[in-house]
Swiss-Prot record:
Source species, domain of life: Bacteria
InterPro entries: Ferrochelatase, Ferrochelatase_C, Ferrochelatase_N
Reactions catalysed, as given in the entry: heme b + 2 H(+) = protoporphyrin IX + Fe(2+)
Pathway the protein acts in: Porphyrin-containing compound metabolism; protoheme biosynthesis; protoheme from protoporphyrin-IX: step 1/1
Compartment(s) of residence: Cytoplasm
Function of the protein: Catalyzes the ferrous insertion into protoporphyrin IX.
A Pfam family it matches: Ferrochelatase
E.C. code: 4.98.1.1
Organism: Pseudomonas savastanoi pv. phaseolicola (strain 1448A / Race 6) (Pseudomonas syringae pv. phaseolicola (strain 1448A / Race 6))
Protein name listed in UniProt: Ferrochelatase
Amino acid sequence: MTDHALLLVNLGSPASTQVADVRSYLNQFLMDPYVIDLPWPVRRLLVSLILIKRPEQSAHAYASIWWDEGSPLVVLSKRLQQAMKKEWSHGPVELAMRYGEPSIETVLTRLSEQGFKKVTLAPLYPQFADSTVTTVIEEAKRVVRAKSLKMQFSVLQPFYDQPEYLSALVESVRPHLEQPYDHLLLSFHGLPERHLHKLDPTGKHCLKDDCCMTAPAEVLATCYRAQCIQSAATFAKRMGIPDGKWSVSFQSRLGRAKWIEPYTEARLDELAAQGVKRLLVMCPAFVADCIETLEEIGDRGAEQFKEAGGEELVLVPCLNDDPNWAKELNRLCERAPLML
């Protein structure tokens, strides 16, 4: 049967490096209540203030990593889409972005017009967060309601602990770890601490004690920090990396609110001060390279590390369109449960 579509969803990107396009993208992204979880008037005021200077700064950053084909995130996601077409045997493989184009609404509407009633929705985020997984699911729900679409959805669950994801990660990173290095830093995207507090169903664990490696299942299911740390520890164990030669940090802090720690910026300085000369950095919260990996870590992070006394920061590429990753992702999508 070929009546079951697969919809891969990633974060998105500005249409170009022009300031106006970056401003439009940032406005859509930051006004999402799952990203900045403040009341609408406060969120609107805060985003308006951010948009005074941030678009020009971000446009410069995007321009520094933009490819001839376009945004690296979009280009790499399209390449993964093509690789997945060789694996997914049940119907078409489509790609949408939560922010920017092609939008979830555009793609779901087209699939409905083509007669597809079964869709596997695949948010390409290994760990769970409201600002990634939940917002994709809720946007799909909104489109279905607004357009009165007759569709059934299976939804790919967070896969930070799944053998398929870990196997793909190990095989992708292995060649880099075969070269001499002093330390491996696993830098995950950060989140405001309040995002974790509000999702702790017990109200007793997240960020109140050091439970990330021992969190009960009900807490672990929605605790982003615990999922990051557990996946990092499992990866390090599978690679045989001794304790002390790897660590975890969190990047991309925005605003003055307290975010989960340790911060990547601080960790880079600490490692250089500890005598680390050749530092490997991988970013396992991302399955495709993007501005947060290429510019924030590969460019600015490398410069900061050298200024602090390090010699070389090597950015390990994300999974991107690796054929082995496509095979493993297909296995994950095959068993996605029916949810909507």
